[in-house]
Amino acid sequence: MIVAARIFAVGGLTSFRALFYWLTPWIYVPTMLVAPIFQILLFAYIGRSAGLESDEFYLIGNALQYASIPCLFAMAQMVGGERYQNTLSAILVSPAPRIPLFFGRSLPVLLNGAFVAAFSLLVGALVLGVHLPASSLAPLGLVVLIAAYSCTGLGLINAAASLRIRENAVLSNVIFGFLLIFTGANVPLDAVPKWMSTAAQGMPFTHAIAAARQLAAGASLGDVRGLLGAELLVGAIYGVAGYALLRWFEVQSRRYATLERS
């Protein structure tokens, strides 16, 4: 139990720190802290000029949705990067239990995604002059954490795909685009075709964004518990599927004695 806990905590943190091994950590600021603010401003001003939704609508949608950048790219890089640096094979031949090994790498990503979303939400609100009720801040923090958890589950699937795709950044960008369009971040789900709104129910962020907007409008945490439960379920399904894919690809790699099957 102690060994598993150490693998979960120390292994995950070490792997996350390795993301910045070759790059100066200062790249974190424009990528994770500045870019989401400009995304929020872009859609907010488009909405203003077109007379569509309020600044609050675009603020909440884009702040939460931008958590997909750290969640998708970091999870893929943790596996794909170790594969590229030839350390993944040494990890996979170790007797370490796989659940703490893989999910331990997810925890720093989850926390980072939640931080990016929370930072974007607060700074974006200050820039746009959006008032968020003080009573909604703590519930919104919980929603942000759940949203990051849900997308980290999808990121685990993305990480598994990096064992078969050489340039996973392309796939990560495609998934980011789908989440931007389908989750209601910028277009209300009742304004899109039925099949899109149906598909959105199985995607990260959809329920979290809806819950956050209700909380900002004055709803209580109890009023959105159904939406939060749905978001947790979506994240759990993606997480289990991602872990299963990683294990299956590991078995295939052992069978063919190589990780290079892409």
Q: What spans do the regions from the language model cover?
A:
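Hydrophobic transmembrane alpha-helices and immediately adjacent juxtamembrane helices
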Residues: M1-S262
